[in-house]
């Protein structure tokens, strides 16, 4: 595994931002869309940027394998030999890209021993880049400024602010929550961008009931971890990476703090 340095992190940030510029070019014109085997859309932008990221990361760290959402047919028997690898989603929020909402991002993370240790989330249409590295902290670059992202308390007397992907998702989440508490839902596309709402203090958590891949959560996990946050499944267990044949995550919660009694929002008293 490469040594975690600010130089490595800066190189990955630049690669993610370059990938974002390619997405911006595709965004300005009509793109070809087809459905994958899992019935999710993929565009020529996904495929082009996946190849771009693969080439750039290979040049940066030739010894580190790469797993992309668009090139994930690598058997577990081979992946089990990887101690470290790059995990990428070239276009997180493909449907948002197709719908021209601007709510999509590039996700790049470095995973070591089944846990992310470096992550970059770049939102090209928002002009924002979020990045973190183990032991380094979490930061946001926007409008020429680099801002250190800080932990924020959850106000017990206020409604819990929850990021979700749609109004339908909000109702699905509401159905499993403690009905004695108040909630405020914020709708946003792209799994990565929902996690940045938590990092920015707009939301207290992001709850996902539905299909996501490991590439959707890795960069967010290290971002929130460096802020003192937490990601867990509905059995209060951490997410893991590259341990199963499938890349599908369980339902999960991304929270801004480990010190909140998360179990109370799922149980009526």
From Swiss-Prot:
<keyword id="KW-0479">Metal-binding</keyword>
<dbReference type="InterPro" id="IPR020583">
    <property type="entry name" value="Inositol_monoP_metal-BS"/>
</dbReference>
<dbReference type="GO" id="GO:0008441">
    <property type="term" value="F:3'(2'),5'-bisphosphate nucleotidase activity"/>
</dbReference>
<feature type="binding site">
    <location>
        <position position="89"/>
    </location>
    <ligand>
        <name>Mg(2+) 2</name>
    </ligand>
</feature>
<dbReference type="GO" id="GO:0046854">
    <property type="term" value="P:phosphatidylinositol phosphate biosynthetic process"/>
</dbReference>
<dbReference type="InterPro" id="IPR020550">
    <property type="entry name" value="Inositol_monophosphatase_CS"/>
</dbReference>
<dbReference type="GO" id="GO:0000103">
    <property type="term" value="P:sulfate assimilation"/>
</dbReference>
<feature type="binding site">
    <location>
        <position position="69"/>
    </location>
    <ligand>
        <name>Mg(2+) 1</name>
    </ligand>
</feature>
<feature type="binding site">
    <location>
        <position position="91"/>
    </location>
    <ligand>
        <name>Mg(2+) 1</name>
    </ligand>
</feature>
<dbReference type="InterPro" id="IPR006240">
    <property type="entry name" value="CysQ"/>
</dbReference>
<dbReference type="Pfam" id="PF00459">
    <property type="entry name" value="Inositol_P"/>
</dbReference>
<dbReference type="GO" id="GO:0005886">
    <property type="term" value="C:plasma membrane"/>
</dbReference>
<feature type="binding site">
    <location>
        <position position="216"/>
    </location>
    <ligand>
        <name>substrate</name>
    </ligand>
</feature>
<feature type="binding site">
    <location>
        <position position="92"/>
    </location>
    <ligand>
        <name>Mg(2+) 2</name>
    </ligand>
</feature>
<feature type="binding site">
    <location>
        <position position="89"/>
    </location>
    <ligand>
        <name>Mg(2+) 1</name>
    </ligand>
</feature>
<keyword id="KW-0997">Cell inner membrane</keyword>
<keyword id="KW-0460">Magnesium</keyword>
<feature type="binding site">
    <location>
        <position position="69"/>
    </location>
    <ligand>
        <name>substrate</name>
    </ligand>
</feature>
<comment type="function">
    <text>Converts adenosine-3',5'-bisphosphate (PAP) to AMP.</text>
</comment>
<protein>
    <recommendedName>
        <fullName>3'(2'),5'-bisphosphate nucleotidase CysQ</fullName>
        <ecNumber>3.1.3.7</ecNumber>
    </recommendedName>
</protein>
<dbReference type="GO" id="GO:0050427">
    <property type="term" value="P:3'-phosphoadenosine 5'-phosphosulfate metabolic process"/>
</dbReference>
<keyword id="KW-0472">Membrane</keyword>
<feature type="binding site">
    <location>
        <begin position="91"/>
        <end position="94"/>
    </location>
    <ligand>
        <name>substrate</name>
    </ligand>
</feature>
<dbReference type="InterPro" id="IPR050725">
    <property type="entry name" value="CysQ/Inositol_MonoPase"/>
</dbReference>
<keyword id="KW-0378">Hydrolase</keyword>
<dbReference type="InterPro" id="IPR000760">
    <property type="entry name" value="Inositol_monophosphatase-like"/>
</dbReference>
<feature type="binding site">
    <location>
        <position position="216"/>
    </location>
    <ligand>
        <name>Mg(2+) 2</name>
    </ligand>
</feature>
<keyword id="KW-1003">Cell membrane</keyword>
<comment type="similarity">
    <text>Belongs to the inositol monophosphatase superfamily. CysQ family.</text>
</comment>
<dbReference type="GO" id="GO:0000287">
    <property type="term" value="F:magnesium ion binding"/>
</dbReference>
């Amino acid at each position: 595994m490469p040594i975690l340095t600010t130089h490595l992190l800066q190189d990955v940030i630049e690669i993610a931002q370059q990938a974002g510029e390619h997405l911006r070019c595709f965004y300005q014109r009509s793109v070809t869309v087809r459905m994958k085997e899992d019935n999710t859309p993929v565009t020529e932008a996904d495929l082009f940027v996946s190849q771009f990221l693969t080439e750039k990361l290979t040049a940066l760290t030739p010894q580190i394998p790469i797993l992309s959402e668009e090139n994930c047919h690598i058997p577990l028997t081979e992946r089990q030999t990887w101690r470290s690898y790059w995990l990428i989603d070239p276009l997180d929020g493909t449907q948002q890209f197709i719908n021209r909402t601007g709510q999509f991002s590039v996700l790049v993370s470095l995973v070591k021993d089944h846990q992310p240790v470096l992550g970059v989330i770049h939102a090209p249409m928002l002009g924002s880049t979020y990045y973190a590295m183990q032991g380094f902290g979490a930061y946001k670059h926007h409008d020429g400024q680099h801002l250190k992202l800080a932990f924020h308390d959850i106000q017990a007397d206020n409604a819990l602010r929850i990021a979700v992907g749609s109004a339908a998702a909000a109702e699905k989440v509401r159905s499993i929550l403690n009905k004695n508490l108040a909630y405020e839902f914020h709708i946003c596309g792209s799994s990565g961008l929902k996690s940045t709402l938590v990092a920015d203090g707009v939301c207290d958590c992001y709850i996902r009931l539905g299909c996501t891949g490991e590439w959707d959560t890795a960069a967010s996990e290290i971002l929130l971890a460096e802020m003192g946050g937490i990601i867990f499944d509905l059995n209060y267990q951490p997410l893991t990476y590259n341990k199963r044949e499938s890349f599908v995550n369980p339902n999960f919660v991304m929270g801004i703090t480990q010190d909140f009694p998360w179990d109370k929002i799922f149980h009526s008293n």
